[in-house]
């Protein structure tokens, strides 16, 4: 499986064409059933990133990455030599406790790779990006200049 440009994948409006494009770009052996709300959240996140980044088109993530046998899914995952960026997408209101629990669980699974992990959740209905620090959540303003991705 290959990482894909989230900018590219959010330009296509037709879900069937998008599934074909995602399969071609990622190299999956099957068509991924894309959820409409997740696509809309990804579009909203990409639009926000465009306001503060010139090269959003270059951001590459593994979309809907699953750990075999565990069935654990990561919405957006970027793996580099020295760090991992995990972004979970939400469309509706989710409690901070639920977000924290999910991000801590994700961090646990990803920690075996031995890299610095940056964990985020983007809630599109609130246009809210939160980051997991050590064990707490902090609100991030997307326009902040320090971005790990």
Question: Where would I find each of the regions flagged by the language model?
Answer:
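Acidic-basic catalytic patches of nuclease active cores, encompassing PD-(D/E)XK
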Residues: 1-63
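Active-site metal-binding core of divalent-cation-utilizing nuclease and nuclease-like domains
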Residues: 53-81
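Extended hydrophobic/Leu-rich segments
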Residues: 66, 138-141
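Acidic-residue sensor for enzyme active/binding pockets
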Residues: 73, 88, 144
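Nucleic-acid nuclease catalytic cores
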Residues: 85, 90-138
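Single conserved hydrophobic/aromatic residue that forms the stacking wall/gate
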Residues: 140-149
């Amino acid at each position: 499986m290959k990482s894909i440009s989230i900018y590219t994948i959010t330009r296509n409006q037709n879900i069937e064409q998008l599934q074909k494009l995602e399969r071609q770009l990622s190299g999956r052996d099957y068509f991924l059933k894309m959820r409409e709300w997740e696509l809309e959240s990804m579009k909203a996140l990409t639009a926000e990133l465009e306001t503060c980044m010139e090269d959003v088109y270059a951001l590459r993530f593994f979309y809907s990455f699953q750990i075999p046998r565990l069935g654990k899914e990561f919405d957006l995952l970027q793996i580099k030599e020295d760090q991992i960026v995990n972004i979970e997408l939400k469309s509706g209101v989710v409690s901070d406790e639920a977000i924290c629990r999910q991000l801590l669980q994700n961090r646990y699974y990803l920690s075996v790779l031995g890299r610095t992990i940056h964990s985020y959740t983007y809630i599109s209905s609130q246009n809210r990006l939160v980051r997991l620090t050590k064990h707490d959540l902090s609100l991030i303003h997307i326009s902040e200049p320090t971005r790990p991705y």
